Amino acid sequence: MHLLATSSATLDDLVEPIDLRQAPADMLALSFTDSDLAGIAAAWGAARDRLPSLRVANLRDLRHPMSVDLWIDTVAAHAKVILVRLLGGHDWWRYGCDRLATLAREKGIALALLPGEDRPSDERLTETSTLPADELAALLACFREGGPSNMAALLEMMAGLARGEKVRAKAKPVPKAGF
């Protein structure tokens, strides 16, 4: 005799809510990619005396809706600029994207939702962000080009946004090979 499965479960169903226990900061950066977060943290560490406060978080720690809610209420609600780089687009972190968009519009927070894949833009992320497409493209170019100087430029752009300025800096092209 065969029994039909009447329920299903995914790996995300097994995720427990957690509290990241982060203090609020003016600038927030989130990504699923450790290399993104390490590059941003290193660039901030080199210029911390002249940049606004920064917190970074890995999105794998914010998969449970209760974790997202707690983090938004205790950390994101106090930010001036929030940058999120998403692998898989809006649907891979839908609840977080929607909650951040609502918060950003209510509080006037600069919100940049950027694609993590190799594509020029993501229409849904652009629509959900509070920044214009040209500013999102400038921020994304820093990740596309990569390297310490572009992570420093990214933080300068974020610092400007935290001060209410438009994004003016541009990513510096990095040679694909050689010097």
Predicted regions and their residues:
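An N-terminal assembly and electron-transfer interface module characteristic of large anaerobic redox
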Residues: 1-179
